[in-house]
Amino acid sequence: MLNNRRIAVVLPAYNAAKTLRRTIEDFPPGIVDDIILTDDASRDNTVEVSQELGLATIRHLENRGYGGNQKTCYTAALERGADIVVMVHPDYQYTPKLITAMASMIAYDEFDFVLASRILCGSALKGGMPLYKYVSNRALTFAQNVLIEQKISEYHTGYRAWSREVLERLPLRACSDDFVFDNEMVVQAIQFGFRVGEISCPTKYFQEASSINFTRSVTYGLGVLETAIMFRLKRLGLAEPGFLDDDPGKRLAGPDFKAPPQKAPVAAMAALAGVAVVGAWLGIRLLRAAFRG
């Protein structure tokens, strides 16, 4: 507990049996009030290890995806009375030793959510991040900052902390169940005016650490750009993306929500229009930035 605010850590897990114990051992003592692990139909003994460690354990019988797993994590944390929720990946890629610092930034009302950036300290490549991922990370972050008009050093970290107010307010049910969930959630928080903070975070890539392959990375990158473009189109009054709709029914605390499928021709036309309008605008901004540099 910090400043009389209850701290919960959520662990969205998939095949994390080999690294879970090491992750928990690095938790700072005396700070975390609740630890919740949601297992997304792992093929190993993640659930058994979690139960041995005494963690509150939730098991998906079918894989719901990375975003779907987080929805379960945050819902459980809210139901169990958390005031601040820190998401830590149980693959030991991010150090849990920053939990106190991240939670403090929210507990003392400096920020509403905090991102742990691997870029601020320049440790990404030193920690083993593949070069193509580093380059794409920087390119995507630059494009996102231009489109969203922010100065965030990294949108793609999996290490985050959120206030209860943010989690109760965002329409998270409307977000993707896949990896782009992370970006949609950040964009939602910016859209609704919440304060974002960052903290420098080392990272490490190793055999047991989870990482998406090249094909899924490309899919993720396209999803990230689409998310930022739709944000810009909404600000320009040219689109009303569902994940940015301020609908109480799409919140985790709201009634069950299932997004209606969008017809393919309509989605395609919206995407083409978005690329045309925002592409021209982004090109101008990039040229201006190049001439300034």
Residue ranges and their predicted role:
Residues 62-79, 96-179, 206-215, 225:
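Acceptor/aglycone-binding surface of glycosyltransferases and processive sugar-polymer synthases
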Residues 16-19, 42, 95:
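Donor nucleotide-sugar binding loop of glycosyltransferases
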Residues 14-29:
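Short, well-formed alpha-helical segments that are part of the catalytic scaffolds
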Residues 41, 65, 93:
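A short, conserved beta-strand element in the Rossmann-like catalytic core
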Residues 1-3, 149, 174-293:
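Hydrophobic helical membrane-anchoring modules
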Residues 8-12, 36, 59:
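Short hydrophobic beta-strand elements that form part
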Residues 82-93:
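Short beta-strand-to-loop acidic/aromatic patch adjacent to the donor-nucleotide binding site
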Residues 39-47:
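A conserved acidic beta->alpha catalytic loop
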